[in-house]
Amino acid sequence: EVARAQHEGLNVFAETCPQYLYLTLEEHLSQPDFEGAKFVCSPPIRSRHDHHHHQSDLWKGLRMNELAVVSTDHCPFCFKDQKTLGRNDFSKIPNGLPGVEHRMELIYQGVVLGELSLERWVETCCTTPARMFGMYPKKGIIAPGADADIVVWDPHQKTTIGINGKHHMNTD
């Protein structure tokens, strides 16, 4: 629908988040002892049985600029004090996942896997968001006159995502 609207010249855009590119219903939401509540978000994480098609469509959308940006919908909650509020009533589980801290490296993994070009990685995570929020060309580009917001990226750095070493204190 987004591609059709864009083709018709409508000023529309769409986004995705890292969790929809990598997580699956069976591996995350179906964990025992209510652990799956950690992964409740909207829209919901999809089943492994349709995830290949679903996730490959999302990667294709990023490559084809049908999905303009990768955001996070960053909305972290602690499991013990917040997510467990829904133990007896699913509707009381706070809805959301963290994502700001690891967004860049998760989407860079798409570059490593051949899902996205290096240039498109920069566009979806930096340049396009700067344009959308009216900050371009001060932000989102390395050029004379632009702010010198530069990240030195080590493509060989290994990261383990988990509760230890997180910089955001409201998530586990």
Annotate the PLM regions:
Residues 3-4, 82-84, 164-165:
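Short amphipathic alpha-helical segments
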Residues 22, 78-80, 160-161:
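Glycine/Thr-rich phosphate-binding loops of Rossmann-like dinucleotide-binding domains
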Residues 38-42, 66-71, 116-119, 164-172:
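Short secondary-structure transition/capping segments
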Residues 1-70, 75, 86:
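Histidine/acidic residue-rich metal-binding segments in metalloenzymes
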Residues 69, 76-155:
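His/Asp/Glu-enriched, well-ordered alpha-helical/loop segment
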Residues 18, 154-157:
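Non-catalytic surface loops within mature trypsin-like serine protease
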Residues 32, 86-90, 160-172:
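Short, surface-exposed loop/helix-turn segments at secondary-structure junctions
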Residues 62-64, 142-146, 167-169:
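A structural signal for short secondary-structure junctions
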